[in-house]
């Protein structure tokens, strides 16, 4: 059974923070051979949130939601990740559904943005994201900016 959690950054304890940083490093830095500073100063500020999926006390899926203080800046979903041990279980779909739901619940009138690896454009399109930029290089991997407008009728 999977334990899904949607936490404000202030709710993260040290073991949880360690687990999410470890998973991000394992996949984004080591597996994808992409040396970059993952700890970017955005994890523990403002209204930022963290979505976590746990099974047997192991973090198996994660996403970060960044809410800027600027009301004109879209809410950003990023660091979307499923551990190697849990791939093939459709957790990415469940994770993105929960990420979009969290954004709609917390910031219903805000558009959403994500920087997608270009080959995952169709995956994110199923959640209402459309291309917002041309394809660009980020750390040697082709990416595309994608945006999702708020659903009509949503109120703050």
What does each of the following model-derived ranges do?
Residues 40-45, 69, 137-138:
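A short beta-turn/loop motif at secondary-structure boundaries
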Residues 82, 88-101:
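Conserved acetyl-CoA-binding loop-helix of GNAT-fold acetyltransferases
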């Amino acid at each position: 059974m999977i334990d899904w959690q949607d936490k404000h950054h202030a709710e993260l304890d040290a073991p949880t923070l360690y687990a999410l940083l470890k998973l991000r490093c394992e996949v984004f830095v080591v597996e994808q051979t992409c040396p970059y500073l993952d700890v970017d100063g955005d994890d523990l500020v403002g209204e930022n949130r963290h979505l976590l999926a746990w099974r047997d006390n192991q973090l198996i899926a994660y996403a970060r939601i960044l809410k800027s203080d600027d009301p004109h800046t879209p809410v950003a979903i990023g660091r979307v990740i499923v551990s190697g041990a849990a791939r093939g279980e459709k957790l990415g779909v469940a994770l993105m559904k929960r990420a979009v739901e969290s954004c709609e619940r917390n910031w219903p009138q805000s558009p959403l943005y994500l920087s997608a690896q270009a080959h995952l454009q169709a995956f994110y399109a199923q959640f209402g994201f459309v291309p917002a930029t041309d394809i660009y290089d980020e750390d040697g991997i082709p990416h595309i900016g994608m945006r999702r407008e708020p659903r009509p009728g949503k109120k703050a």
